[in-house]
Curated annotation (Swiss-Prot):
May contribute to some of the local and systemic effects of envenomation by the scorpionfish. Preferentially recognizes mannose-containing carbohydrate structures, but its interaction with single mannose residues is weak. Potently inhibits alpha-1-beta-1 integrin (ITGA1/ITGB1) binding to basement membrane collagen IV in a divalent cation-independent manner. In addition, moderately inhibits both laminin binding integrins alpha-3-beta-1 (ITGA3/ITGB1) and alpha-7-beta-1 (ITGA7/ITGB1). Does not bind alpha-2-beta-1 integrin (ITGA2/ITGB1). GO terms for molecular function: carbohydrate binding. This is B-type lectin plumieribetin. Expressed by sting venom glands and is also found in skin mucus. Not found in other tissues tested. It is found in: Secreted. InterPro entries: Bulb-type_lectin_dom, Bulb-type_lectin_dom_sf. GO terms for cellular component: extracellular region. It comes from Scorpaena plumieri (Spotted scorpionfish). The lineage of its organism: Eukaryota, Metazoa, Chordata, Craniata, Vertebrata. Homotetramer. Interacts with alpha-1-beta-1 integrin (ITGA1/ITGB1). SMART domains: B_lectin. Not glycosylated. Not N-glycosylated and not O-glycosylated with the mostcommon O-linked glycoconjugates. The N-terminus is blocked. Keywords: Lectin, Secreted. Residues 1-109 form the Bulb-type lectin domain.
Length: 113
């Protein structure tokens, strides 16, 4: 369960860890939240007009509104790549890999508005 380049989540979509214990949800209020038994991490974008969360070909995970304006991103634009992947670990952490090397994770960074 992961996002690769050019994949996207819409409101209500989610990623689930392989062990099924954690879920990352792009909520209807535009907040992207990791849940275990309780919320563990959030993009803090609740109430924004964002409608989709896109894994771009440059390895930047970006939340856009309906007009195509960025509302949040991981600030990981690194140029085109062969493989870019966002996944939720069995420990409840979002990890973004470029060419199998970690370039961002939710434990160390909230992302940027």
């Amino acid at each position: 369960n992961y996002l690769s380049k050019n994949d996207e989540l819409r409101k209500g979509d989610s990623l689930v860890s392989n062990n099924g214990e954690f879920k990352a949800v792009f909520q209807d209020d535009a907040n992207f939240v990791i849940y275990g038994w309780q919320p563990l991490w959030a993009s803090d974008t609740y109430g924004s007009d964002a409608i989709r969360l896109c894994m771009q070909a440059d390895c930047n995970l970006v939340m856009y509104n309906g007009s195509g304006q960025a509302r949040w991103h991981t600030n990981t634009s690194k140029g085109d790549c062969n493989m870019c992947r966002l996944f939720l670990t069995n420990e409840g952490k979002l990890v973004l890999n470029k060419e199998s090397t970690e370039i961002w994770n939710s434990d160390k960074n909230k992302g940027s508005k």
